[in-house]
């Protein structure tokens, strides 16, 4: 690779305005409550690029820091040894190209190690991970660069996570669409063989009038959605769930000039 030539491209990108990483779609909507303010929305193909949107959200210096509530089929927290202070302390998160390159090249390419780095940089107060499996890891902690401790709590029960969420903190909602997939027992756990949950179950979770989303909605300040088609049983399944999410959350206005949350 011609490093000097590539460096020239990075310092002089073609186009106007900022450039988001490939495979990422940026959207803005008013807050679900209708209050003044903006809800930043990021749609990513690979889950680690959600870090890009979490970083941009953190620039707003919201006080108190929101909780990260992540719905996932896998544990994407990562391990302490893979939090590299030298990388993170020197990351210029206001430089979108540098930030995008960091997500691409320095976060785990398996897309399972982006939450601890976010806590190290104090993007969130704590992380609450809702998994779609019977078994769950033990709760953990992560110190940030200022020495403050952040808690990582795991759940596999929606009612329990709703009960445990601190009522006074805003929420950044992160949804990996493979949360709505299940293992195909006839396919020997091959990636791409997953089956989707039934439509009524998916809709009941995502409905803004449903028992899960309704108590959360007024607290949401940001949203990331990871398509992860390889873990959803293919692109068709992933886009099918995205279509349901778009309808239930945004009344089919996602990625249009009139994107807005569905009225309850």
Where are the predicted features?
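Catalytic cores of soluble, metal-dependent hydrolases
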Residues: 1-67, 90-99, 103-264
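Short, conserved acidic/polar surface loops in the N-terminal third of protein domains
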Residues: 53-56, 78-84
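Long, hydrophobic, well-ordered secondary-structure blocks that form the structural core
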Residues: 68-80
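Short secondary-structure boundary/capping segments
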Residues: 83-86, 189
